[in-house]
Regions:
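Conserved "HGTGT" condensation-loop signature of ketosynthase/thiolase-family condensing enzymes
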Residues: 1-90, 111-114
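Conserved catalytic cysteine-centered active-site region
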Residues: 40, 46-54, 64, 96-134
Length: 134
């Protein structure tokens, strides 16, 4: 059996909505029993995170699904996503938090990428599966 050499030649990302500062977090995630978190400032000081991106409105309404965000990141790989997707032969996606269990996460991402045609899909499942090897 011969193995083909595979290289990562491009990366992309997608971040939903505007960045949310530490002071705004609870406006999106809510309070604990109607009160601000007692340990929030300590945790945030120690983890060093200054802002994050939520796929939520301030009222807690979802703005993007996990599979939609993955597909938008994939589209970011190409100047012309419709044309570039025609060359994709394999879509493999790993997540610990899929939108649902069936169909698989990779199948749902594939559904958001109609120009990828008959690309194969692989969807490893489980905790910390971003490091899964097949």
């Amino acid at each position: 059996m011969s193995l083909n050499q595979v290289y990562i030649v491009r990366t992309a990302h997608f971040l939903p909505n505007e960045p949310v500062s530490n002071d705004e977090m609870e406006e999106y995630l809510g309070l604990i029993n109607g009160k601000p978190s007692k340990s929030r400032r300590i945790v945030l000081r120690n983890n060093g995170i200054k802002r994050r991106f939520y796929a939520l409105t301030r009222k807690g309404k979802s703005t993007h699904t996990n599979s939609e965000m993955a597909a938008l990141a994939v589209k970011g790989l190409f100047t012309d996503a419709a044309e570039g997707m025609k060359d994709v032969q394999l879509i493999t996606c790993g997540t610990s938090t899929p939108d649902q269990f069936l169909p698989s996460h990779a199948s749902m991402v594939h559904g958001w990428l109609p120009d990828s045609g008959n690309a194969e899909v692989v969807s490893p499942s489980g905790a910390c599966c971003s490091d899964a090897c097949t």
